[in-house]
Amino acid sequence: MKEVVRTEILKLLEVGIIYPIADSRWVSHVHCVPEKGGITVVPNDKNELIPQRIVTGYRMVIDYRKLNKATRKDHYPLPFIDQMLEILSKHTHFFFLDGYSGFSQIPISQPDQEKTTFTCPFRTYAYRRMPFGLCNAPATFQRCMTAIFSDFCEKIVEVFMDDFSVYGTSFDDCLSNLDRVLQRCEETNLVLNWEKCHFMVNEGIVLGHKISERGIEVDRAKVDAIEKMPCPKDIKGIRSFLGHAGFIGGS
């Protein structure tokens, strides 16, 4: 786990997202948590099959609970998913854009940077840019993205956090809309992750749903995951199943 932390620290230092800090009234601790992929089933001590997420690696996280407890909560809302999907499903051509390292594109004011201080086996650091783990990070990011694209939303693009869905009723219409969105990204220094972008497609997965001119469908991968789940044997298993089934039911 120490190497996981070392690798992440060196990466963040290299790009200037964090910097060493000598002292702070706010110090949070680092942890490593498993990164999980798909779902498999494994036998328990009673030889019953139970669902289990596949661990694909580990990542560094910071426990900001102490800071979050003292933070005044920002209740800025996220967009209504069903309304977004309804708008998108009425179109035939799409560009799906992805923001690069989402939260880290938001700078933190100098006086507040020391509040993000964290300690690890090497030394103590603070963030210049917004890290994951802060209770107001999602609201702050959504507010920023909405402000950037406020005059485009519900017209040529739908914005959910760092997922930007550009749409149009024809090839030329969608291409023109993309040009306007990319110009806005350049004007505001918003960086995109081209490797995760999909250009000029007739359908795509948005927030776990497949959208196209045919309408809104559930992502088949979600259905397959439920079909592979064994019959729940206890309360934990029932909750897990209901969580997955509720997603389908809400669709």
Language-model-derived ranges and their functions:
Residues 1-251:
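Retroelement reverse transcriptase polymerase core
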